[in-house]
From Swiss-Prot:
Protein's recorded name: Probable splicing factor YJU2B
Gene Ontology cellular-component terms listed: post-mRNA release spliceosomal complex; U2-type spliceosomal complex
Compartments it resides in: Nucleus
Coiled-coil residue spans: 183-212
Region (Disordered): 1-28, 275-331
Entry superkingdom: Eukaryota
Basic and acidic residues composition bias: residue spans: 297-331
Protein family (similarity comment): Belongs to the CWC16 family.
Organism name: Xenopus laevis
Length: 384
């Protein structure tokens, strides 16, 4: 488009280059258009940017540095050969006009009217900035040799005071001198960290897959390891440690039971400790009489006995009745004794079985049936 604008301009038929010179002269216009409407007065409209913070005198509002205005630019004088320009602009918050102009002597802008500057300046010497050489001082350095010598001594003293800071800055800069080596070292470090992160992610993903979980794992820390170790529900000792502990207990264990004299121990205990199995004595045979079982008599025998003990007048004799009571009491005493002996025998069998199991031998189990006699229809029961 720019190329077409330069080559495809329309020249009317009455255009005379000797008379008009250019199309702008033919149309009586300026290339800057509206910006040059006051050019006859020496005023050019430009875009001015506020150089520092100010307060407007009309509305007392704050105008920040960098705010732009359409300002009228006008030349008002010279500083030596440097022109001094004045800028006039309207506040965007009120109808007040602000005027500012350049100050080439101090390389700054000065407010002429309409505003006040927000004072944020400081002494360049106190702030350790580079000072601009004054014109008078420059002329004196060129003409006065003694002043130049004193100024050189001051510069050397200042250099000695700044030497440690300068050397420190040089060391910092030298660290970044070989940028290729530093970049290679940094990239290798990044690759190692990336590899570690990838391994941790794979390990975490395998753990989540194994546990069928769908959550984000946080990085593991040493404190979490200690807490997790305390929450384990299994022994912390390994299989080898358990076996070693068990062997040491067996080696340190006494061959003789505590509280029993070695001379009073039975030979069977020594045989068990040596690992020699002995034949377990069998339990003596149990007969129905030892268990207190009473054989029932038939009805015919009961009738015969009743007839033999009845008196001629048809009543049971006192003698027969006393014999029955005596027989019944004897049966009950015999049953009580048999029951106590059976309980004692069962207790001995239980103790023997537990002892053999503790010593690693297979106990011989003997089943003892407990028969309960029924005396509801015995011959000793009194009738009607």
């Amino acid at each position: 488009m720019g190329e077409r604008k330069g080559t495809n301009k329309y020249y009317p038929p009455d255009f005379d280059p000797a008379k008009h010179g250019s199309l702008n002269g033919y149309r009586n216009s300026h290339p800057l258009r509206e910006r040059a409407r006051k050019l006859s007065q020496g005023i050019l409209i430009i875009r001015f940017e506020m150089p520092y913070n100010i307060w407007c005198d009309g509305c007392k509002n704050h105008i920040g540095m960098g705010v732009r205005y359409n300002a009228e630019k006008k030349k008002v004088g010279n500083y030596y050969t440097t022109p001094i320009y004045r800028f006039r602009m309207k506040c965007h918050l009120c109808v007040n006009y602000i005027e500012m102009q350049t100050d080439p002597a101090s390389c700054d802008y000065v407010i002429v009217s309409g505003a006040q500057r927000k004072e944020e300046r400081w002494d360049m010497q106190d702030n350790e900035q580079i000072l601009t050489t004054e014109h008078e001082q420059k002329q004196r350095l060129e003409t006065d040799s003694m002043f130049r010598l004193e100024h050189g001594v001051q510069d050397k003293a200042k250099l000695q005071r700044a030497a440690p800071s300068l050397s420190e800055l040089q060391e910092v800069q030298s660290a970044w001198k070989d940028d290729f080596a530093i970049n290679s070292l940094l990239r290798s470090k990044f690759r190692e960290e990336k590899k570690q992160i990838k391994e941790e992610e794979e390990r975490d993903q395998a753990l989540l897959t194994k546990a069928s979980l769908d959550l984000k794992l946080v990085p593991e820390v040493e404190e979490d390891k200690k807490i997790a170790a305390l929450l384990k529900y299994r022994s912390l000792e390994s299989y080898e440690q358990k076996q070693k502990k068990k062997r040491s207990e067996i080696c340190n264990r006494s061959w003789f039971s505590p509280g029993v004299d070695s001379g009073q121990q039975a030979p069977g205990n020594t045989m068990r400790k040596l690992g020699i199995r002995t034949k377990t004595p069998s339990v003596p045979g149990i007969s129905p009489v030892s268990l207190g079982v009473v054989r029932r008599t038939s009805k015919e025998e009961n009738k015969a006995e009743d007839k033999s003990v009845e008196s001629p007048d048809g009543s049971r004799s006192r003698k027969a009745e006393g014999m029955c009571r005596k027989e019944e009491t004897g049966c009950k005493e015999e049953i009580t004794e048999r029951t106590q002996s059976e309980c004692k025998l069962n207790t001995e069998l239980t103790l023997t079985t537990s002892t053999l199991a503790a010593q690693g031998q297979t106990p011989t189990i003997h089943t003892v049936s407990c028969l309960v006699p029924n005396y509801s229809d015995s011959s000793c029961e009194s009738e009607g």
